[in-house]
Amino acid sequence: MLSRPRFRPHFHVEIVPGEGVVLLSDTRHSLLRGRLYELMVPWLDGRTADDVCARLRAEVSPAEVYYALTQLERKDYLCEEEPALAAGQAALWSSQQVAPRTAVRRLAERPVVVRAFGVEAGPFRGLLESLHVRLADEGPPDVVLTDGALRGELEACNAAALRDGRPWLLVKPAGRQVWVGPLFRPGKTGCWECLAQRLRANFPVAAYLQGRNGHAGAVVQDRAATPATLQVGWGLAANAVASWVVRGELPELEGKLQTLDLPTWRLQTHALIRLPFCPACGAGGSRGFQPPALAHRKKTYTSDGGHRVVRPEETLARNGHHVSPITGAVPLLERADPDGDGVLHVYVAGRNSARPFRTLGQLRSDLRTMNSGKGATDTQARASALCEGLERYSGIFRGDEPRRPARQAELGGAAVPLNDCLLFSERQYRERETLNARASRFSFIPVPFDPRAEIEWSPVWSLTRGEVRYLPTAFCYFDYPQSEERTYCIACSNGCAAGNTLEEAIVQGFLELVERDGVALWWYNRVRRPGVDLDSFGEPYLEHLRAFLQAHGREFWALDLTTDLGIPVFASITRRTDGLPEQIMPGFGAHL
C-alpha cells in the first residue's frame, strides 16, 4: 500500500454532496459512489494512511479506510506523494501512467545529446531543460535537428549509430510540414539510408538538382519558418524526447515518421520500411537469384475480369502502409475522376518511374506521367492503382540486383539475343537519329547492340525451357545507369505486374503480353476485327457505363482482337458524338 497516498495529479477531484466523488481528466472520468469517499477526499493530500485513518476515526473504522485506499490504488487513481514538480508536468506524467517521481529520476539519470545541421538548437535545448531532461554536450547524438532530411551530415550520423547499435531520433522543425521521427533503432527498424532512398524517389526534383549540380548537402526545400512555427516543431519533438527518456521506448515513432501540416493541422504517420538490401543496414551486395518455386493457388476473387487469391479490400489492407508521399514506395493514391458519378473509377498512384530521365525537360515530362488503376468499383480501382505503383517501384534499378559482367559469347546459349526482344529492323537502326528526333520517348531506338561489348547481364527464369537465361540488366530494370554511346536498350514495363502472390503476378504479366500481342497484330497489319456484342453479356455495369457516356456526348464499343493463342483480347473504344474532333480513345485488356 502507498505510504502517502494522494490522487493522481492529472485528476480534477470534486465532491458531489450526497452522491459521491467525480474524478475528471481530459481523457477519462470516474465516479466514486458512497459517503466514505466524500469523507476521505480532503485528507488524501500526501498524508500517511495512518493519519487519514486517525482523521476519520470518529466516522468510519480504520478497516473501511484501508479497504477504500486499497481499491483506489488498485484502480490506479492514487499515487505516492511526489517531490516538488510543476503541477502541469506532474499531471502529464501521471496521465501516462508514470509516477512523477519515477519520471524525475529517469530524466536525471539519462543524458541526451543534441546535434543540429542547418537549424538553431538553442531554443530546443531550452525546452528540454524545462522538461528536466538532462543535456550533455559530448558524445554521439541522440537527437538530430535538420533543415533537410537528405543532408550529407546525416549519412555519418547513421553510420556511427549503426556501428554502435545506438538509436537516434530525427527532427525537422522547419518547413510547412514539421517532421518528428523516425526513431531509428539499429537491427529493428530501417535506417537513415532506407529513408533517404525513399526521399530521393519521392522528391525527384530535389534529387535531380543535387546530382546534376553537385550540391554538397541536400537541396533545402523547407524554407518556411517563423519563430512560432519553429516553436511548434521544437515543442512536439521535446515532448517526444522526454517521453522516450522516461519510458525507455517510443513505439509511436520507432520506425515511423509523424508529420504535422501547419496550415491544415493534418497529422499523418508514415511507415519507414526496412529495406532488406540497404547498403547501410541491410545485407548489401547482390540479392542473389533463385528459380521461382511455383505452386497452385486457390482463386477467391474472379470478378471484374481478374483472377486473384484475395479480394481487393484485402490487397489494400495488406499493402496500404506502402502509400506515403514521404516514405512510401507509392507516394499517393488519389481519385482521378471526382465526377465519375459512381460509374467511372480511376485512381492515380504517383509518377510513372518506368521512364528514365537525363535532362530537366525529360524530368518535367516524367512528372506529368502517372501510374493509374481502374475498376468497376472504387475499391477495385484503388487496388489496381496501388499494384501498378508497386509494380513500377519494384522494377527500378538500385544496385543490389543479381547481375554479372560478360560478353554475350561468354554466356553461350544461356544469353537471350537482345534483338530477339527488341525486334528493331536494320532500317530503324540506320535511321535511328532521325526517327528519335521526331518520335516520343516511348519509341526510342537505342544504339545497335555490340555482342563483343562487356555489359552486365541478369539471370531470368525461362518458364518454357525450365532453365536460367540471361538478359542485359539494362533491359530488365528501369533507370539502369548507362552512357549514351552504350545504350543498347532500355527497360519497358510491358509484361510487368504486381500480385498478391508470385503466381498471381506472373498470370497478370503474361496476360498483358497477350493483350499487347493482339493489339500489335491488329494495328500494324491494319486488319479488320469483329465487334463484340456487349448486350449479350447481360452485365448491368455496361448499361450504366453506356448511359453515363451518352450523357457526356460519347459512345463506346468493343472489338475482338483475340489471336491464335485463344485467350480473349478486347479493345474498348470510345468517341465523341457531339462534335469534332471525335477524341477517339482506346483501351485494351486480355483475360482468361
Spans of features found by a protein language model:
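Helix-coil modules at protein/domain termini and other flexible surface or pore-lining loops
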Residues: 1-5, 10, 14, 20-25, ...
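E1/E1-like adenylate-forming module used to activate ubiquitin-like modifiers
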Residues: 127, 141-235, 243-249, 261-293
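Conserved beta-strand termini and adjacent loop/short-helix elements that scaffold enzyme active sites
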Residues: 16, 136-139, 171, 194, ...
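Short glycine/serine/threonine/alanine-rich loop segments
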Residues: 133, 166, 554
